[in-house]
Amino acid sequence: MEDQQRLEEIVNQLNIYQSQVELIQQQMEAVRATISELEILEKTLSDIQGKDGSETLVPVGAGSFIKAELKDTSEVIMSVGAGVAIKKNFEDAMESIKSQKNELESTLQKMGENLRKITDIMMKLSPQAEELLKKVRGSGE
C-alpha cells in the first residue's frame, strides 16, 4: 500500500509540473509575440525616419486601411501602459524599444531556464513512477 501512495504522490506532482510547463510555454509564446511586435515597430520607425510628406497606409480596423501623409517623423507617441501614451523624440523611442526588447529577451531566457528545470524534475520522477507502477501491478496480481 505504501508503494501505491507514493505512486499517487508522484503522479500528482507530475500533473502539477505538467500544468506549470504548459503555463510557462503559453507565457513564452506571449513574450515572443511581444518581441515580434517590437521588432516590427523598430523596422517601421526606421523605414519612415526622415520621410516627412511621404504617403503611407494607416490601419483603421478589420483589415482596412486609409492613405495618409506623414507630417512629422521626428516624434513618436508611445504607449506606456494603462491607457497612457507619451511623446518621445525618434532616438528616445528607438532606445525605449531596444530596452523593452532586451528586457523581454532576458525574461524569455529565464522562463526557458525554469522550463528546463521543471522538465529535468519530471524526467527524474517519471522513471520512479514507472517503477512503482510495476511494483503495484506485480503485487496486485
From Swiss-Prot:
It comes from the Archaea. Molecular chaperone capable of stabilizing a range of proteins. Seems to fulfill an ATP-independent, HSP70-like function in archaeal de novo protein folding. PANTHER family: PREFOLDIN SUBUNIT 5 (PTHR12674:SF2). This is Prefoldin subunit alpha. Heterohexamer of two alpha and four beta subunits. The keyword Signal does not apply. HAMAP family: PfdA. One of its GO terms (molecular function) is unfolded protein binding. One of its GO terms (biological process) is protein folding.
